[in-house]
């Protein structure tokens, strides 16, 4: 009797497992890790509830310089898909993490590795040989491409296609999510373009070269940078030249990323009367900016307020 009872229990648990395991497999989400919060925001738009997504760099951090932590390795070891910005933006910290994760799915060239720059229109691609004397110039072009909504659309489409490759059963879901995102983005672009139209041609100065895609899309003229060269801290001589340029060009706005020191920009503002604005290059730079649409709403709102008050 004991043996029969044991067999019955074994069969019972086998049947339970047979029913539960397919359900668990069917409901398992793709585990997506991104290098930046912007890639995470776009992945969430098209992945919906079929993915879990986490970013390594947060929106208030400089994505060029991220301090590696053991927790990052834990995230990468469990990832089904890694999405990075590329163009060597993360070259100082991400490659060692990928290697040390020992996750074959996300190694460079593997099915679970996605460089989003391949989908985008890239600006400021250097001509000729690039040397360290020119600062931290990206030899493959400017990596801050997500600040153009057209590139955001391209990235989202590329991510949706990659998710479909990894999870063919949900391919139609990812395509539908992209189409819905595309409709909302097209409507938002019409609104943003209309809001910015009166300010096309306005001159601005930025701290770092993180603004060219945004500026080109909305018709702004970036006349100079607080950095004398990319990644090089401000120098007294360059600051004096920049102050003279701002006065000569009647520039009214200096834009600074949230992770740079405001001391030099504020001194420039005092000397020229230009407004110094901390704008957000990434989702999550402020708590209320939680998605791709809110990023543009926030930055455009700041710019319009600054342009209006300068007249």
Name each model feature, range by range.
Residues 1-11:
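Bacterial N-terminal signal peptides that target proteins for export
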Residues 25-311:
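Extracytoplasmic metal-acquisition and chelation regions
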Residues 5, 19, 25-27:
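Intrinsic disorder/low-complexity segments
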Residues 9-22:
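Bacterial N-terminal signal peptides
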């Amino acid at each position: 009797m004991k043996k029969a009872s044991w067999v019955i229990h074994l069969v019972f648990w086998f049947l339970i497992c047979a029913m539960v395991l397919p359900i668990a497999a069917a409901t398992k989400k793709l585990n997506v890790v991104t290098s930046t919060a912007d890639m995470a925001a776009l992945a969430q738009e098209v992945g919906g509830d079929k993915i879990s997504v986490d970013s390594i760099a947060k929106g208030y951090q400089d994505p060029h310089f991220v301090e590696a932590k053991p927790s990052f390795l834990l995230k990468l070891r469990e990832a089904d898909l890694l999405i990075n910005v590329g163009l060597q933006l993360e070259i100082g910290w991400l490659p060692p993490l990928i290697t040390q994760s020992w996750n074959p799915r996300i190694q460079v060239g593997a099915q679970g590795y996605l460089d989003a720059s391949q989908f985008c229109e890239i600006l400021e691609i250097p001509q000729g040989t690039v040397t360290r004397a020119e600062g931290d110039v990206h030899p493959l072009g400017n990596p801050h491409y997500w600040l153009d909504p057209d590139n955001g659309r391209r990235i989202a489409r590329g991510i949706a296609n990659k998710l479909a490759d990894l999870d063919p059963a949900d391919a139609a879901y990812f395509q539908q999510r992209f189409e819905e995102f595309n409709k909302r983005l097209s409507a938002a672009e019409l609104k943003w373009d209309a809001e910015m139209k009166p300010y096309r041609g306005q001159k601005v100065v930025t701290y770092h070269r993180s603004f060219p895609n945004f500026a080109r899309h909305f018709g702004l003229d970036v006349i100079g940078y607080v950095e004398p060269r990319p990644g090089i801290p401000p120098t007294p001589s360059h600051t004096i030249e920049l102050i003279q340029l701002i006065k000569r060009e009647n520039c009214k706005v200096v834009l600074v990323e949230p992770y740079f020191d405001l001391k030099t920009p504020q001194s420039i503002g005092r000397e020229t009367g230009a407004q110094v604005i901390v704008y957000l290059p990434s989702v999550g730079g402020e708590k209320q900016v939680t998605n791709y649409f809110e990023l543009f709403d926030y930055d455009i709102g700041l710019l319009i307020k600054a342009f209006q008050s300068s007249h």
